[in-house]
């Protein structure tokens, strides 16, 4: 499984990339592999506010429908419509195909997520 060094990871197999007070959020290589070929992705609207642990959206595949849990508090400021229109992008490029960008409410929450090495160890358990 591919794990990128410059991202943060949740136990729900969601990655977070921080740029200032903005965070891009997507699913990991492990998550997309477990789900199989994504057929439909439901994403929130810009302006929606979330608390860490809330369901951010849903990814449906031939295997299953899976909720995507947001690991940080924030307000959606961008939605990746390309992924909604072509869900297979999360399979072919899970780390390049972010789902949403949020304005972080508490940057300290990001530091509580796993870094790449911790996430790799988590995957081994």
From Swiss-Prot:
The modification N6-lipoyllysine is found at residue 63. InterPro entries: 2-oxoA_DH_lipoyl-BS (IPR003016), Biotin_lipoyl (IPR000089), GCV_H (IPR002930), GCV_H/Fam206 (IPR033753), GCV_H_sub (IPR017453), Single_hybrid_motif (IPR011053). It comes from the Bacteria. The glycine cleavage system catalyzes the degradation of glycine. The H protein shuttles the methylamine group of glycine from the P protein to the T protein. Its cofactor is (R)-lipoate. HAMAP family: GcvH (MF_00272). GO terms for biological process: glycine decarboxylation via glycine cleavage system. Residues 22-103 form the Lipoyl-binding domain. The keyword Transmembrane helix does not apply. It comes from Caldanaerobacter subterraneus subsp. tengcongensis (strain DSM 15242 / JCM 11007 / NBRC 100824 / MB4). Binds 1 lipoyl cofactor covalently. Belongs to the GcvH family. This is Glycine cleavage system H protein 1. PROSITE patterns: BIOTINYL_LIPOYL, LIPOYL. Keywords: Lipoyl. PANTHER family: GLYCINE CLEAVAGE SYSTEM H PROTEIN, GLYCINE CLEAVAGE SYSTEM H PROTEIN-RELATED. The keyword Cell division does not apply. SUPFAM superfamilies: Single hybrid motif. GO terms for cellular component: cytoplasm; glycine cleavage complex. The glycine cleavage system is composed of four proteins: P, T, L and H.
